[in-house]
Amino acid sequence: MTSAALKPLSVAPARDRAASRPRIAVRRWLFLMAALVVAMVAVGGATRLTGSGLSITEWKPVTGAVPPLSAEAWAEEFAKYRATPQYDILNRGMSLAEFQVIYAWEWGHRFLGRLIGLCFFLPLGWFWWTGRLDRRLGLGLVGLGVLGGLQGAVGWIMVASGLQPGMVAVAPIKLAAHLTLASAIFAGLVWLAAGLDRPAEAAAPRRLRLTALLLPVATLLQIALGGLVAGSKAGLTYNTWPLMDGAFIPPVSGLFAATPWIENFVDNVALVQLNHRLVAYALLALALLHALDARRARPGSGAARRAAALAGLVAAQAMLGITTLLLAVPLWAGLAHQVTAMLVLGMAVAHARIGTLARG
């Protein structure tokens, strides 16, 4: 028998052993991508809080990667911004140096988005080519890539809403959609990473697994409501706690003052802030009850420790949110609150995903 005939027999076992090894590189890459998304959200938050989001008035996915490099190019970009309602209403008289600062924030946000795209698709192609991704994982990653491309389009739609006549900021519902989609992509990355070659634990009771799955869903809802708070600047109103204008729940007549009534959920700052408060209370209660239940049902287990850590992080986020409100959203507090929300989501997703891998 020739060596050529023996070669497939020797390669096959090696390939099987390689396929069965923990996909450490893939997992690390996914967690790195998740960290980059958190950085993207943080820079986006800073861009919003510094009023920089409308400084670039065009969407050029390729050529826009290069910032203005000459005095003439800067003058051209500044002229475009001076034609916007935001400049005319809020920033009339802004100097070129001041414009360059806000431009840098928005350009940095978009550049980071491009960098994330490269860091995602290039390794994805390599991992798939080298056989490190099974079909299910690969399709999940392609789906996340599609969402990432969609996120760029949603970002521009959001910016374009703030360039319309009479507008000085982006539409709250579009800002919330942009933030929620980024958070969903982050959650998807963590879900896939946490599910790669994790040692399975003993199965927790079904109720614990269900509440663990409910926690990231509730967190994502709370992030969406936070996006509405940010977009409508509701955090600059009712800067007291636990009462809002002297009441735990303001009068219904004020909460639903606009018509049609559905618009109040987006445009009425009182209802927008109240919804964010109420879901925060519900999320905190759910996290605490889940931690207590896990400690009682599986004392000393990994699930109990993760549930306790998650409850502690949710409590810290609630206190940070109250502080941010009482201080009327200073830059540092607003950014910390937004980033911590992502950490809560990431921990909730990882906790839920590991729970699904438990042995029955």
From Swiss-Prot:
The keyword Iron applies. The keyword Hydrolase does not apply. Interacts with CtaB. Its EC number is 1.17.99.9. Catalyzes the conversion of heme O to heme A by two successive hydroxylations of the methyl group at C8. The first hydroxylation forms heme I, the second hydroxylation results in an unstable dihydroxymethyl group, which spontaneously dehydrates, resulting in the formyl group of heme A. The chain crosses the membrane at residues 29-49, 111-131, 139-159, 175-195, 210-230, 269-289, 309-329, 330-350. It is a multi-pass membrane protein. Its main location: membrane. Belongs to the COX15/CtaA family. Type 2 subfamily. Heme binds at residues 276, 337. It is found in: Cell membrane. Its cofactor is heme b. Keywords: Cell membrane, Heme biosynthesis, Iron, Membrane, Metal-binding, Oxidoreductase, Transmembrane, Transmembrane helix. It catalyses: Fe(II)-heme o + 2 A + H2O = Fe(II)-heme a + 2 AH2. It is an enzyme of class 1 (oxidoreductase). One of its GO terms (cellular component) is plasma membrane. It comes from the Bacteria. Coiled coil: none annotated. GO terms for biological process: heme A biosynthetic process. This is Heme A synthase. PANTHER family: CYTOCHROME C OXIDASE ASSEMBLY PROTEIN COX15 (PTHR23289), CYTOCHROME C OXIDASE ASSEMBLY PROTEIN COX15 HOMOLOG (PTHR23289:SF2). Disulfide bonds: none annotated. One of its GO terms (molecular function) is metal ion binding. Pathway: Porphyrin-containing compound metabolism; heme A biosynthesis; heme A from heme O: step 1/1.
